[in-house]
A protein has these predicted regions:
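A short helix-loop-beta-strand connector motif used in the catalytic cores of GNAT acetyltransferases and
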Residues: 55-68
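Secondary-structure boundary/capping residues
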Residues: 34, 44, 63-66, 128
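Conserved GNAT-fold acetyl-CoA-binding loop/helix
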Residues: 34-56
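Acyl-donor (CoA/ACP) binding surface of acyl/acetyltransferases
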Residues: 1-24, 28-32, 68-180
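Hydrophobic residues in alpha-helical segments
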Residues: 29, 39, 58-61
């Protein structure tokens, strides 16, 4: 399936990654230990590692519902978001993350609402799932503020460090989305 290449919110642009994004995505997001704490990836140690990751990201985004997140004012890449269709009409997040200095100002909510609008209205989804580490209270609050409801928790083991943690899963149906 061919997905849209760009979406916009009040303060942000969600668009496909480009090699020119290397320094901003590295400095604002990929090198951060704080940001990576609740994510499945490890921080990049240098620009060479980030360059390799950016090439993989560009290739992944060509065929998937995935974007870098850009600040409209500075044009810098500050995070990323991805969703996959796990069953016909059912989507699940593969991550929504922002650099630590961009958290707490409503950007996550803008991104999630924008993605939900696209998934429900353009892709005709019936249901969308999102998840977060149980200890990531700001992420859980953001998901609920966008209309998602707690569904269930599961134990997950991260590949990067074999840490086993509890993941809380949230869901929103097409019907719930349309009533917002």
């Amino acid at each position: 399936m061919k997905y849209i290449d760009k979406l916009e919110t009040k303060d942000l642009v969600l668009a496909k990654a480009k090699m020119e994004d290397l320094e901003s995505i590295y400095n604002n997001y990929w090198c951060s230990e704080v940001t990576a704490k609740y994510m499945l990836w490890s921080p990049q140690k240098n620009l060479d590692e980030a360059r390799d990751r950016l090439v993989r990201t560009i290739n992944y985004q060509k065929e998937n519902l995935a974007f870098l997140i850009y600040d409209k004012k500075t044009k810098e890449a500050i995070g990323q978001v991805a969703f996959v269709e796990i069953e016909n009409g059912i989507y699940e997040d593969r991550g929504l993350g922002l650099g630590e200095k961009f958290v707490g100002n409503g950007y996550g909510k803008q991104v999630l609402n924008c993605m939900l609008e696209y998934i429900f209205n353009s892709l005709n989804a019936q249901k969308v799932y999102c998840s977060c580490h149980t200890d990531n209270i700001p992420s859980a609050r953001m998901q609920m503020s966008c209309g998602l409801k707690y569904s269930h928790s599961i134990m997950v083991t991260r590949d990067k460090d074999l840490l086993t943690y509890k993941s809380d899963n949230y869901v929103i149906t097409r019907e719930d989305w349309s009533r917002r």
